[in-house]
């Protein structure tokens, strides 16, 4: 349902939260006759062999979710104590560019 709603806004790209949701979105797009990457580009915020082996292979961003959660928890605890928190936090990531985002 979320994919159908997103398509109504005619986005350039759909970014999914994990590999399972990404594969579900790809199936729905295929059922609706939407071509990836010709009509829309698709990427995931989690990488897996299933994404690399899908057709088309799906672009993915890999990051340390544990480090993200740890930093978010630290920030929340600081805020709850009334202390100033960082407004900008940078964490490392790696992008695996694949067929689903090529134009």
Stretch-by-stretch model annotation:
Residues 1:
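Helix-loop module immediately N-terminal to the HCX5R catalytic loop
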Residues 4-103:
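Flexible loop/turn connectors
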């Amino acid at each position: 349902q979320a994919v159908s709603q997103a398509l109504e806004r005619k986005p350039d790209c759909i970014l999914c939260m994990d590999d399972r949701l990404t594969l579900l979105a790809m199936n729905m797009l295929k059922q609706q006759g939407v071509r990836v990457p010709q009509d829309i580009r698709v990427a995931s915020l989690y990488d897996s062999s299933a994404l690399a082996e899908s057709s088309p292979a799906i672009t993915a961003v890999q990051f340390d979710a544990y480090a993200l959660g740890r930093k978010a928890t630290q920030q929340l605890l600081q805020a709850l104590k009334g202390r100033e928190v960082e407004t900008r936090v940078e964490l490392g990531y790696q992008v695996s560019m694949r067929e689903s985002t090529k134009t």
